[in-house]
Design a protein with these regions (language model features):
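A short beta-sheet element
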Residues: 29-30, 48-112, 229, 249-306, ...
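Sequence-specific dsDNA recognition surfaces
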Residues: 2-19, 31-65, 82, 88, ...
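A short glycine-rich beta-alpha junction/loop motif
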Residues: 69, 85-92, 104, 124-154, ...
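Amphipathic heptad-repeat alpha-helical coiled-coil/stalk segments that mediate oligomerization
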Residues: 386-387
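Non-catalytic DNA-recognition/assembly elements of restriction-modification systems
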Residues: 1-12, 139-212, 333, 337-383
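Short coil/turn segments at secondary-structure boundaries
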Residues: 16-23, 42, 121-123, 197, ...
Length: 387
């Protein structure tokens, strides 16, 4: 059926940007899409006075589905309860008619192979960015089962998403606790405790740069490993578009769950990798130590990230980066053995739970994506699925 028959309306956002405001309503942007949800932790505001002008066409409400139609395509999210704001540029909205379609089913359908084929069929390849012609969007077709089947499929997939969301919230809380402990014990101190000493990042960890993986492609008969590049680090996982490398590379360049990775060129970031086994590309450091725990060198690297980013931006001609010499200039405080053991007894369990939760969330997402593909295509019957 045409998607227009399932919606009370389909609208695009404004083609301009309002003045910035320190408070008011949310001005949704493409950057607020995060893994199929809206991340409202970092938002741009629109003033109460300007809001009426920017909601003339449509006011987003709970259960509406927002999506991108230009530049970065195939971004979708459901407007949450209590949302107060307006659409931004390059965003559009569909309001599901809940008498005809379960809004959750319609949302999940956007991630199906059938819908992606529909997008590809209509997509306009521009000289600078791709776009979906919104004038044609109402005629895009949806394969719609009966309402009971819609609700069952949506319920299964939502349950998995809810479990992932719970894990993420637990981890956010744990990370905040660990960050606060680190700040209290290392950053917000007035003098160096007895037995402590000053050092630098290279004193507490090894920073191994990755390989130019285009030189290490899979050999005939080998099952390739996905390559960990900045894109994968940023999204927290590898995907079908990730490059492949030979599994015969030196073992130190093979990354495993729980490894600390520092991107030192382009987009500078440090994270604990939990996206499965892969090969380390150049422009990324694997950070490790035979003496100190992950929490110690992770937080010290993260502590200096803002300064590293400023240095990289200062040097940027095409792609900013930092040199290994900057690591040697980055000061750290090294505690006494006794104090290190005491702080580790707090930090190690937190880090272990964070890693376990992230691995579980990744596996739940893989299960969800596999079920979505099979349920939407009819490859498996809903009666065969239970969680």
């Amino acid at each position: 059926v045409p998607i227009s028959s399932l919606c009370v309306g389909i609208y695009d956002g404004p083609h301009a940007t309002p003045p910035k405001s320190d408070s008011g309503a949310v001005f949704l942007g493409i950057s607020n899409f995060s893994n199929g949800r809206l991340d409202l932790s970092n938002i741009r505001y629109i003033s109460e006075d300007d809001l009426p002008q920017w909601t003339k066409r449509v006011t987003p409400k709970a259960h509406d589905i927002v999506f991108s139609y230009e530049a970065t395509l195939n971004l979708y999210a459901i407007i949450p309860d209590g949302f107060y704001g307006c659409l931004g540029r390059r965003m559009a909205l569909m309001g599901p008619d809940e008498r005809k379609v379960d809004y959750r089913f319609l949302y999940y359908y956007m991630f199906s192979a059938e819908w992606r084929e529909e997008i590809e069929r209509y997509k306009v390849n521009g000289s600078t960015v791709d776009r979906i012609p919104l004038v044609s969007f109402p005629s895009f077709t949806v394969n719609l089962p009966d309402m009971a089947t819609q609700r069952y499929i949506a319920g299964i997939l939502s349950e998995l998403d809810d479990k992932i969301e719970i894990n993420n919230k637990i981890n956010d809380n744990l990370y905040s606790q660990a960050k606060a402990i680190f700040a209290e014990r290392f950053i917000n101190i007035e003098s160096l405790p007895d037995g402590w000493q000053k050092g630098n990042l290279l004193d507490i960890a090894d920073y191994l740069n990755g390989l130019a993986m285009q030189k290490f492609r899979p050999l005939d008969g080998e099952v390739g490993l996905p390559v960990l590049k900045i894109k994968e680090l940023r999204q927290g996982s590898c995907d079908a578009s990730s490059e492949l490398c030979s599994p015969s590379i030196k073992p130190e360049y093979i990354i495993h769950d729980g490894d600390v990775i520092f991107s030192w060129s382009g987009s500078l970031l440090v994270d604990i990798w939990c996206g499965g086994t892969c090969g380390l590309n150049q422009h990324l450091f694997k950070v490790s130590s035979e003496i100190y725990g992950k929490w110690f060198y992770y937080f010290w690297t993260a502590h200096h990230l803002e300064r590293f980013t400023a240095i990289a931006a200062d040097k940027a001609t095409t792609m900013g980066h930092i040199k290994r010499g900057e690591l040697a200039k980055a000061e750290v405080l090294i505690p006494s053995d006794e104090d290190y053991k005491e702080i580790s007894s707090l930090m190690n369990p937190i880090f272990n739970i964070i890693v376990a939760n992230r691995i579980e969330a990744r596996k739940l997402a893989e299960l969800r994506d596999g079920l979505l593909r099979k349920l939407m295509s009819g490859e498996i019957d809903i009666s065969e699925v239970s969680l």
